[in-house]
Amino acid sequence: MLDPFSEKAKELLKEFGSINDFLNSIPRIVDVEEVIERVKIASDRKLLEGFVDIEDIKDLAQFYALLGALSYSPYGLELELVKKANILLYSERIRREKEIRPEEISLRINKAIEFPIDDLKKIERVFGKLPEYTIHLAEFLDLIPGERLSEYYIYNGNVYLRKEDLIKVWMKAFERNIEKSVNMLYEIRDELPGFFREVLGGIKEVAEQEFGKSGEVKAGTLRPDLFPPCVKNALKGVPQGLRNYAITVLLTSFLSYARICPNPPRRNVRVKDCIDDIRIITDEILPLIIEAANRCSPPLFEDQPNEIKNIWYHLGFGYTANPKLEDSGNSTWYFPPNCDKIRANAPQLCTPDKHCKYVRNPLTYYLRRLYLEGRKNASKGGNERGEKRVLQQ
């Protein structure tokens, strides 16, 4: 298996029915120890040989065991460890393969067969040999937007790639596909067997050995500059018809989880499981919700004064205007709606930016932005053993 996101891999997965069926089958195909051994490739490349030639189904089971585990901690050093180990493994397989077929890799490539006669000698002189593959220029730029095109031969809207170039582009696609898949599994993580939490525990141990610290995103002061576009739009105030969804459903759930419990261990968590003082809600979260409600046209609480009780209900305190912390659990603390639901119920709020393509929920958008910001700051600080090592391949 050259790429777990390829068409060939998708055909194998279809034999199990749905992705949920495959995930439930994984504990019967592989064990926790061999899955954890796989991520150790990141620090010991000698382990590669034990994984290069394994059977396709077993390979997919090990890989999806890691993705399922990451759904409980989608952004952190665990993600970087899984990326690094699997990029090393799959790129080595691609490197050893004599010829790459389009169905074996998650890039829309073709065999390079068309070269203008006048360019042949120049191509061989500049690149050493004729490029073997082509990819459409638009896809290339989407994956590697900052790449210098002058270093590639481009003809008829296609970028010509040698195998080493192909691997570079593939790595970018692979990283994006991992994030997308983890975000997809994030939505169903409460349905996964306990096996995946065991795997996550093992990944965390290896990550701490490899990077020397924990990279988990924790609760803290809100960063509005890192909020997703839909939340920023809701904070500006919305017209009648969108008010209840934008304020009570989206903002209430997003702001509360983002501030109190950005990476909840489960969906049925209660506010009192995460904080000891209700003033975090009354002094930090509720004012933001009320300000956004007052910016609506007309202001939400002017014609719906009881909607404040509904906000507390969505926070898990029951239908009340004056709750105490111990009331937490009287109703469900609503989780932020996913992107599909926002698009369906309030399409005006959905104005995607470049980060949105990686996520499926506004909360994971925020987690991702927080993590990337932390990684950038750590890199600036010259953290030799920590974040800088994450980026080494």
Curated annotation (Swiss-Prot):
CDD domains xref list: PriL
One biological process term in Gene Ontology: DNA replication, synthesis of primer
A cellular component term, taken from the record's GO annotations: primosome complex
MF terms in GO: 4 iron, 4 sulfur cluster binding; DNA-directed RNA polymerase activity; metal ion binding
Cofactor: [4Fe-4S] cluster
Record has Iron as a keyword: yes
Annotated keywords: 4Fe-4S, DNA replication, Iron, Iron-sulfur, Metal-binding, Primosome
Details of cofactor binding: Binds 1 [4Fe-4S] cluster.
Positions that bind [4Fe-4S] cluster: 230, 339, 350, 356
Entry keyword annotation includes Iron: yes
Subunit-structure text: Heterodimer of a small subunit (PriS) and a large subunit (PriL).
Function of the protein: Regulatory subunit of DNA primase, an RNA polymerase that catalyzes the synthesis of short RNA molecules used as primers for DNA polymerase during DNA replication. Stabilizes and modulates the activity of the small subunit, increasing the rate of DNA synthesis, and conferring RNA synthesis capability. The DNA polymerase activity may enable DNA primase to also catalyze primer extension after primer synthesis. May also play a role in DNA repair. Displays gap-filling and strand-displacement activities.
Family: Belongs to the eukaryotic-type primase large subunit family.
NCBIfam families from the UniProt entry: PRK03968.1
HAMAP family referenced in this protein's UniProt entry, alphabetically: DNA_primase_lrg_arc (MF_00701)
Protein name: DNA primase large subunit PriL
Organism: Pyrococcus abyssi (strain GE5 / Orsay)
Gene from which this protein is expressed: priL
